[in-house]
Amino acid sequence: MKHKSRKIITKRLISLLIFITTINVSFAQGYISETIQHDGLIREYSIYVPASYDGTTNFPLLFNLHGGGGTNSVWQVSSDMRPIADTADFILVYPQARPDPSDGNSFNWIPKVPGTFDDVPFFSSLIDTIASNYQIDQNKIYACGYSLGGDMTFELGCKLNNRIAAIAPVARTMQANPNSFCSPSHPTGVLTILGTADSVSVYNGITYFGVEYYISAAATHIYWATHNNCDTTATVNIVSPSVERYSWSTASGCTYVEELKVIGGGHDWPGSFGNMTIDANIEIWQFVSRYDINGLIGCINTSIIEDNVQTDNYKVFPNPFHEELTIEVKSDISNDFKIHNVVGELITSGKLNSQFNTIDLSSLAPNVYILNIKNQSIRLVKTK
């Protein structure tokens, strides 16, 4: 009788251990809901840690941001990247946007009324929190996002550039006047996935009553291509009958900017909804994982900060400059000069007459600019 009871207890104990093990395995393979306190609010996020993580190796970190008015719990189902995280060994995070008081407390990354709040510091705090709990590779932190989440992805690439290595906005171009808010400090990988028939985030930009709110896809890519010292003419490859891949590369062949142009595509996340000839999840990871905080891994990078520029006919200094730029002319031939911002807008122009030409550029915002003299283009950097 005792032997029989012992057998029953043993079977129950084994069953209990199997049950506990099953729970632990399921927990390890599922999202973990977490919170942090920031700016007086309790902020939520879901984190997925692959089973291969054991705390002995630094894992890359990828943020995936939901669209405006959405939630992370729904978005992590719609764009589930866990299978990729399992095979590629990275930590995956789906943060929840905060209530926007200027939009009925709907969940927005970018407030409807400018200045209502700024979520960039939240992401910096979130990175710190995750890094305190997990071994993450601080040189390989990436962000992607859909729609308004794509908008926030650009914000992170611009304003948290010291921590974000590469970005992948989907169904969103950049906000207007990027020179006023975007100051990347290192070569940054940028992938966009855009539908040419998107009625929400219009491919050619959004302008209402003469006011530009979002620049076009073309201007978005030129901005980042210029920042990354890439040729502004892209190479084109056909991915499928409905998708074209545009790539912008440096003179040494290092690609920093790519667009997956979905012909006739709408406000979609390809592979989950909309176009099904590509998988946004796979494309995003394959792209961003090629970069770290120093740029394209294995590529000899040309830094955003260049030294004084000297050619056979001109010398331009100091570069970077603070207020004044001097152009030394080495010949008696006078030439016109033009200075554009990185989206091609003319900032100033004039004629080089004397040997030393001093140009007052103190009114310019700190950023990257392009000086054109005859057929030569020279990259300028304005510092604070």
Predicted feature residues:
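Active-site nucleophile loop of the alpha/beta-hydrolase fold
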Residues: A97, A168-Q175, G195-D198
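The conserved beta1-alpha1 loop
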Residues: F63-G67, A171, L194-G195, I263
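C-terminal outer-membrane/trafficking sorting elements
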Residues: M1, E306-K384
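Bacterial N-terminal signal peptides that target proteins for export
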Residues: K2-S15
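A domain-start/cap signature at the N-terminus of enzymes
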Residues: S26-L61, V74, T87, G115, ...
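Bacterial N-terminal signal peptides
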Residues: I14-N24
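Serine-hydrolase catalytic machinery in alpha/beta-hydrolase-like enzymes
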Residues: I32, I36-S52, T56-Y142, M152-E155, ...
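C-terminal catalytic histidine-bearing segment of alpha/beta-hydrolase fold enzymes
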Residues: V190-I193, I215-S216, A225-I300
